[in-house]
Design a protein with these regions (language model features):
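Thiamine diphosphate
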Residues: 1-123
């Protein structure tokens, strides 16, 4: 199972073609917050929310997934998640599960750039 953000997936989206061509049954959970999430998080935590070039207008990931031979499902509410995960697990081939999440939800823990692991941040 691959967990990826929408920004990260778009940087390597051509690999969906490799998955299709090679018939790799990978399961992808796409955490879509419509931001370059880690960059936005840094700008929030270390630069007083002075956001620059982090908000994204995303393509239709369902069309892209299906166009590359992957099954696809989109979750917009927490209540839909269990059923969508079950569908993904039951799928024999490659599957893209898009989970739309809050735009300013942060990912922790994280280690600031240049800092030792002992300075890990949990909030």
């Amino acid at each position: 199972v691959l967990f990826a953000g929408d920004g990260g997936l778009q940087m390597t989206i051509q690999e969906l073609g490799t998955i299709f061509q090679s018939k790799i049954p990978v399961k992808i959970v796409l955490l879509n917050n419509s931001f370059l999430g880690m960059v936005r998080q840094w700008q929030e935590l270390f630069y007083d929310r002075r956001y620059s070039f982090t908000e994204m207008v995303n393509p239709d990931f369902g069309l892209i997934a299906r166009g590359n031979g992957l099954s696809y499902r989109c979750v917009e509410r927490r209540e839909e998640l269990d059923e969508a995960i079950a569908a993904m697990k039951a799928s024999e081939g490659a599957f893209l599960l898009e989970v739309r999440v809050e735009g300013e939800e942060n990912i922790f823990p994280m280690v600031p750039a240049g800092a030792p692991v002992s300075e890990i941040r949990f909030e």
